[in-house]
Amino acid sequence: MKKIEAIIRRTRFEDVKEALLAADIEWFSYYDVRGVGKTREGRIYRGIVYDTSSIERILISIVVRDKNVEKTIQAVMKAARTGEIGDGRIFVIPVEDSIRIRTGERGDIALYNAEQEK
């Protein structure tokens, strides 16, 4: 199993969500996050552009079976890419175990309901 974390533009979230659902990735978490980097973003407030080093993004967190890693990465990349600086990053992290609290099931079987198996 792997945990895939993707930091994407807020404006691309709906496209990424739809791409993940189309790739049969049925569950993920997402969070509003801020980062600081060399690239600055301008914010417009009452018609004035303010320069800021704080960059607002969405962090998507998905745990998938090893066989679904590449299709998940490709779905995120295709939907999140604009070709501009600041499109984001994807991180792939090993997951040692997964436990379904309700049943005690362990391993990749705990990731999905039996009727959702693909």
Regions found by a protein language model. Give the residues of each.
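Positively charged, small/polar-rich N-terminal and surface patches that mediate targeting and assembly
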Residues: 1-118
